[in-house]
């Protein structure tokens, strides 16, 4: 999943978005060799120890999109994985938008749909429904305008893998930290048993 997400990130996101707190050589942590990193993921860097930066500068980004494309190094920590997954799945065509695209969870987003060739093009109709108490709920009706190269299941998997990779980029040591945490808790549990036994031994004459 992480390798698939890294490939999607390099092919579709790294054209505009930096991940400047992440170095290419850290991708060895997810099972990629240096040769695989060089051949498949490094399009704007010469050395495997460089950070993931793009040639697009903030000034050009603001001119093209209205705002500079944000760095994605910690986007999963600031937005959450669930939000990113929903965001990637809810783009739709909007002729009123400057880019021709809009998003259901991020209205008037400046970013066009980078994965549209995979998901295809869709339209969205938001239908409000009011109950007897006057509470209004919204129904989102999606319609396919043009199919993409992936079906719904495949695209959802692509979005999931990309989000997993962004979570990894936000904290590359996260997996090892969790493993270390489990070991530490296990050791503390053993120490607690010995400490409790020692306490009973010290206090048995008093009780």
Protein language model annotation of sequence segments:
Residues 1-7, 18-32, 37, 170-178:
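Electrostatic cytochrome c docking/interface patches
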């Amino acid at each position: 999943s992480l390798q698939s997400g890294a490939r999607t990130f390099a092919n579709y996101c790294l054209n505009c978005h930096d991940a400047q707190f992440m170095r290419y050589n850290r991708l060895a942590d997810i099972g990629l060799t240096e040769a695989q990193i060089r051949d498949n993921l490094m399009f704007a860097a010469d050395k495997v120890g460089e950070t993931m930066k793009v040639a697009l500068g903030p000034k050009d980004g603001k001119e093209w999109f209205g705002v500079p494309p944000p760095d994605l190094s910690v986007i999963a920590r600031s937005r959450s994985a669930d939000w990113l997954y929903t965001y990637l799945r809810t783009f739709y065509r909007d002729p009123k938008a400057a880019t021709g695209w809009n998003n259901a969870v991020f209205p008037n987003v400046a970013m066009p749909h980078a994965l549209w060739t995979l998901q295809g093009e869709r339209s969205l109709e938001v239908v409000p429904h009011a109950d007897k108490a006057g509470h209004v709920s919204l129904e989102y009706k999606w319609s396919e305008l043009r199919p993409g190269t992936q079906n719904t299941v495949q695209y959802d998997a692509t979005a999931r893998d990309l989000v997993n990779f962004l979570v990894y980029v936000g904290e590359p040591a996260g997996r090892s930290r969790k493993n270390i945490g489990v070991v530490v808790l296990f050791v503390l549990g053993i120490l607690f048993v010995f400490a409790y036994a020692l306490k009973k031994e010290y206090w048995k004459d008093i009780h």
